[in-house]
Amino acid sequence: MFLLYEYDIFWAFLIISSAIPFLAFLISGVLSPIRKGPEKLSSYESGIEPIGDAWLQFRIRYYMFALVFVVFDVETVFLYPWAMSFDVLGVSAFIEAFVFVLILILGLVYAWRKGALEWS
């Protein structure tokens, strides 16, 4: 049976690290002056009064680029520890990593064929 008192430092750090941001927001909310006016409600565009609607929508194509980037960024996160311990893991880990990369390459080819990587 494991002993819970061995985790006292962990729980102390968890409580302190959770309390510090909460206290920072609480103290800034209590000490900051609250002045509402028309200037606070206007949108800021480099010190110039906004002309027209200040709302800007992103095209859906940007979403696809971001999604493909996240997939390959996560791939890098998974492959880096594997590459650092490649000599210890052996051939089976190499085959598993190869299958992992192959599945991601198939996904990239599919996205490419569907036109997800074209900005037009």
UniProtKB/Swiss-Prot annotation:
Signal peptide boundaries: none
Main location: plastid
Natural source organism: Aethionema grandiflorum
InterPro entries, A to Z: NAD(P)H_OxRDtase_bac/plastid (IPR023043), NADH_UbQ/plastoQ_OxRdtase_su3 (IPR000440), NDAH_ubi_oxred_su3_sf (IPR038430)
Entry keywords, A to Z: Chloroplast, Membrane, NAD, NADP, Plastid, Plastoquinone, Quinone, Thylakoid, Translocase, Transmembrane, Transmembrane helix, Transport
Annotated compartments: Plastid, Chloroplast thylakoid membrane
Assembly and binders: NDH is composed of at least 16 different subunits, 5 of which are encoded in the nucleus.
Family (UniProt): Belongs to the complex I subunit 3 family.
UniProt-recorded Gene Ontology molecular function terms: NADH dehydrogenase (ubiquinone) activity; quinone binding
TM annotation in the entry: 9-29, 64-84, 88-108
Record's catalysed reaction(s): a plastoquinone + NADH + (n+1) H(+)(in) = a plastoquinol + NAD(+) + n H(+)(out); a plastoquinone + NADPH + (n+1) H(+)(in) = a plastoquinol + NADP(+) + n H(+)(out)
Annotated EC: 7.1.1.-
Gene: ndhC
Function in brief: NDH shuttles electrons from NAD(P)H:plastoquinone, via FMN and iron-sulfur (Fe-S) centers, to quinones in the photosynthetic chain and possibly in a chloroplast respiratory chain. The immediate electron acceptor for the enzyme in this species is believed to be plastoquinone. Couples the redox reaction to proton translocation, and thus conserves the redox energy in a proton gradient.
GO biological process: photosynthesis, light reaction
Example of a GO cellular component annotation carried by this entry: chloroplast thylakoid membrane
Protein name according to UniProt: NAD(P)H-quinone oxidoreductase subunit 3, chloroplastic
Membrane topology: Multi-pass membrane protein
One Pfam family this sequence matches: Oxidored_q4
